[in-house]
């Protein structure tokens, strides 16, 4: 005869609720960090696209001896005709619109404007000039060019 009671091994409701709370706290901490990393990777892609557009502008200058005529608006500004108009350059989702502005025969300014899911990026609009000056416009308080470029 056995006087031992059968022990059952299982989770109690309280233990399960503690696990759910811990997972919720971890997710609450991790998700904003994840979003920041995703935005940063899209920003890196936009910087690469701006540099690609800069190379296309130089190629256009080599062929035409002017920067004029590289855009869709009056041939000088707006979306580029010498390169892709958005970043990423492939796919259907657009995170940055590329534009050309302030074009003369010897200078230009390029911009990557965040759109869609990237519209709330703390760096705002990334700009690049024909002399290689990198800048940001409409950035959040305390954000510097060094943080974004």
Which residues fall in each region the model found?
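Periplasmic/extracellular, small/polar-rich flexible segments of pilin-like filament-forming proteins
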Residues: 62-149
């Amino acid at each position: 005869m056995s006087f031992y009671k059968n022990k059952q091994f299982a989770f109690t409701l309280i233990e399960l609720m503690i696990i759910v709370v811990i997972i919720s706290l971890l997710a609450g901490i991790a998700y904003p960090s994840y979003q920041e990393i995703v935005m940063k990777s899209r920003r890196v892609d936009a910087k690469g696209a701006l540099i690609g557009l800069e190379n296309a502008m130089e190629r256009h200058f080599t062929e035409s001896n002017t920067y004029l005529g590289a855009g869709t608006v009056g041939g000088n500004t707006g979306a580029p005709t010498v390169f892709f108009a958005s970043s990423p350059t492939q796919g259907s989702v657009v995170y940055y619109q590329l534009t050309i502005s302030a074009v003369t025969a010897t200078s230009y300014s390029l911009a990557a404007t965040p759109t869609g899911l990237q519209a709330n990026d703390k760096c705002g609009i990334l700009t690049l000039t024909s002399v290689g000056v990198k800048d940001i416009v409409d950035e959040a308080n305390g954000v510097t060019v060094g943080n974004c470029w």
